[in-house]
Amino acid sequence: MSEQNNTEMAFQIQRIYTKDVSFEAPNAPHVFQKDWQPEVKLDLDTASTQLADDVYEVVLRVTVTASLGEETAFLCEVQQGGIFSISGIEGTQMAHCLGAYCPNILFPYARECITSLVSRGTFPQLNLAPVNFDALFMNYLQQQAGEGTEEHQDA
């Protein structure tokens, strides 16, 4: 066999944790007496930090705002963190891992936390749809490449 500089990729979840939680219902209790037809806004953000060689913290911030007209019914924010051991990849592959793969792992935990908080606030059940972090990451890369560049698709 020919000699290759073949570093094997390794990925391990060390810990998943809730880093920060906030729930506000600024217009309770009178908001409970209104017809429940909210406008729900979902904001997502990710951040990653290298903690040590091959050890990274990824934080997924999920903010949900439900409004009835001009009034905020509730505002819920969860920062779901994870510590991951990742080795054998670099560059765009590492950026994809930290910006899409890890958030895909963290999102169900954040979604469950938000659902629980909304329920404890006695609001109707909130079911957040799955998020395609791979597509969001690709959009981010395209934005970074600048407007007017040709789109590339992976085969």
Swiss-Prot record:
The Gene Ontology CC terms held by the record are: cytoplasm
This protein's record includes keyword Cytoplasm: yes
Tell me where in or outside the cell this protein is found. Answer: Cytoplasm
* Keywords recorded for this protein, A-Z: Chaperone, Cytoplasm, Protein transport, Translocation, Transport
Record keyword Transport present: yes
GO MF term set? unfolded protein binding
| Functional description taken from the UniProt entry | One of the proteins required for the normal export of preproteins out of the cell cytoplasm. It is a molecular chaperone that binds to a subset of precursor proteins, maintaining them in a translocation-competent state. It also specifically binds to its receptor SecA.
Q: How does it assemble?
A: Homotetramer, a dimer of dimers. One homotetramer interacts with 1 SecA dimer.
- Name the HAMAP family for this protein: SecB
Q: What is this protein called?
A: Protein-export protein SecB
List the source organism.
Answer: Citrobacter koseri (strain ATCC BAA-895 / CDC 4225-83 / SGSC4696)
